Each structure stands twice: as structure tokens, then as C-alpha cells.
Amino acid sequence: MMAEFHYGGQAVIEGVMMRGRRHMTTVVRRPDGELTEDTQTLPSLYTGRLRTLPLLRGIVVLIEALVLGVKILMYSANVSLEEEGEKVEGWLVWVTLAFSLVAAVAVFFVAPLFITNQINVESNVLFHVIEGVIRLAIFIVYLELISLLPDIKRVFAYHGAEHKTVNAYEAGVPLEVEAVKEYSKAHVRCGSSFIFTVLVLAIIVFSLVGIAEPTFWMMLLARILLVPVIAALGYEVIYFGARHAGNRLVRAILAPGLWLQSMTTREPDDGQIEVAIAALSRVLEAEESEEAPAEAAT
């Protein structure tokens, strides 16, 4: 029996990507107001057995988010720039991604460690709690700053549209704008909740590493090498939370991550909801069209 699949997506520039079991569809609103779409079959790496294995699936999802995320952002950016006759070069996007990853590790992992190291803290646990609070504070300030940018505000609104659409679909209501707009712009499986979970888990994991009383440089190396491990653990927490979202204790644990979504989502307008609905509808059609021949053969 095939396990239940949870649809999800990502907001992009003037659009939304929705991911199915074996397909993903990106729908973007062109400068002239028309919608354009791109549906692709997902590589086997993102749909095979590795994506079902605990811990390993978290790393696969992380790779998928980075690689496919860059591709769909490049697609949406090029659609948005069509009117100006410009195009985003692929190599520039990958260079930007590499720089962003290095900057993210430096700002969210190296900087908090360096700052905390300047404070005379003897307790291993307290040291890592302070470091974790600094890391979380930096992340919140970062979100506040980028949310001031007009283009990012629109991406956050598409993020809200994506959540509303998935929530409506999971509730079994028709995928129509008037029905979808009534649903919440927060979702338990959101990447924002995942990031918050990772930041909290980092405190626990780094505290365990600190028991060995490593040098500053060893702690720094551990911060970098353990990022994939913490991400894998974070995915398992979100995966468990999504499957037990009705449990009050689970919802209480996930509440801070849901709160964080108030910073990464905005109330979408009808046009943005229309884009999200189109993306989910197209990927559902792609999934159904693939299953139909197999059913006919039986």
C-alpha cells in the first residue's frame, strides 16, 4: 500500500512551485499578467528509496531544496525579466548560491560562536544556550530586514498563498480562490518551522560536542561539519510533527516555528492565490496522468 503523500511547495519571484510525488510544477505570473508554467519529472534521487529512510531523507530533502530551489528561482527570475529583454545566467545563480551558503554558515554558525567565546562563561550548557539565543536573534533580525524589501514582501505573500492552497487541498475543499483564501497562511511543514527547529536542535547537539571541551577551532569545525546532521534531525522532527499535528503536545512544541511563519508569510491577494492554485492543480494533473496508464494496464 502506497504511503500518503503530502504536497508542498515554495514561493518564487512572482510565482509558486508545487511538488508532487514524482513531478513539480512552477507557475509564474508574467509582466503582462498571463500565467506561464513549467512542469518537470523529478530526478530519481528525490523520489527513490533514499527519500524514505529516516535521517538520510532529511539530507536528500536539503539537497533537493538547494538544487531545485536554484533552478526554479532562475526560471521565475527569467520570466519576470522577459519584458526587459534580460536573462539571468545559470553560472551567476550557482555562484550566488555558493556565496550565500558560505555567508549563511559564517553569519548563523561562526559569528554566534565567536561572540559567545568573548564572554566568560564556564558552564558548557549555558555557553551553548547563549550561543543559540544569539543565533536565533541574528536570524530574526535578518528576516525583519529583508521583509522591508518590496520584492521580498511579494515573495512572502506568494508563500502565504502556497500555504493556504495546500491547507485547502488537505481539507478537501474545491481549489477555488474564494474557498482557499479562508484558510491559514501557516503550515506545520513549512521551511520556516524547519529552520527554527534546526536552530533549537543546534543548541542540544553543540552542547553534547562541548562536553569533550574542544578548542575554539575544533568547535568551529564541528559547527560546519554537523550542519547536515542537524538538518537531518530537524527534518525528522518536522516529519513527526506533521503526522501528529492533532496532538496538543506536538502542536505546543511546533508553536514557535508556526509563530516564525508570521514573519515569512503575508496575506496574499486573489491573483497570488490563483497562481498557487494553478501550480497545485497542474502538478496533480501530472501525477494523475502518470498513474492512469498503469491502472489501465492492470
Model-derived features: positions:
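Multi-pass alpha-helical transmembrane bundle typical of ion/small-solute transporters
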Residues: 43, 49, 62, 66-91, ...
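Juxtamembrane "helix exit" motif at the C-terminal ends of alpha-helical transmembrane segments
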Residues: 71-79, 100-123, 198-222, 228-231, ...
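Polar-ligand-bearing catalytic/cofactor-coordination segments
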Residues: 3-18, 26, 32, 129-134, ...
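A transmembrane-helix-recognition feature enriched in membrane-embedded lipid enzymes
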Residues: 54-80, 240, 244-263
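Hydrophobic alpha-helical segments characteristic of transmembrane helices
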Residues: 77-123, 127-149
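Membrane interface segments of multi-pass transport proteins and intramembrane proteases
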Residues: 80-87, 114-130, 210-221, 240-251, ...
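Alpha-helical transmembrane segments of multi-pass membrane proteins, especially transporters
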Residues: 97, 101, 127, 131, ...
